[in-house]
């Protein structure tokens, strides 16, 4: 396997409905799609990964935690540079007004075009109810996002993304991976492939 898969995951704060608008816009601007900051910086500008994205995943139930996630599919020999680039982005959010405006427009159009019909009305109601939201919140999200500025997004990033401690998962050919580069991220725990992909019975973890 020439390509290595890397997943960065951090447990965030407990779900807060007041952050839904900011997290929705943030995901479009920062981590999702070909025009996002993460993809443009890591894939297009620096050619450090085949694919890359990041997202702030909100909980699906009130009282549960949100999660910060980032992913890269990169060549094993590019792991050191790719990790440095990703961690820099997850610590210091680049601010590009043109991309921010485009992300806001795309997010607003997506909300405006969303149609919930038939049985989906019930399931949407149930999903919102689990979050402690008693009514359709799309209009409120739209109005909030419409008024948001880069400063609002920066404040959201600094409070919810910057400074998080990540668990990093790597899948790849062991002989091609730079373990010294990974050691800079923390303690390494190697998992046996038979443990990960054992479909017959679960054995004890081989270290």
Label the model's feature ranges.
Residues 151-158:
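Mature hydrolase/peptidase catalytic cores and their serpin-fold inhibitory cores, especially
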Residues 18-25, 30, 177, 186-189:
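PPIase-associated folding chaperone regions across multiple families
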Residues 89-95, 183-194:
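A common structural junction motif
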Residues 38, 82, 156, 178-181:
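Hydrophobic side chains in well-ordered alpha-helices
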Residues 184, 193-207:
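Extracellular/periplasmic ectodomains of large secreted or surface enzymes and adhesion receptors
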Residues 2-14, 23, 27, 39-151, ...:
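M16 family metallopeptidases and their MPP-like homologs
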Residues 16-18, 78-81, 175-180:
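Short, conserved charged micro-motifs
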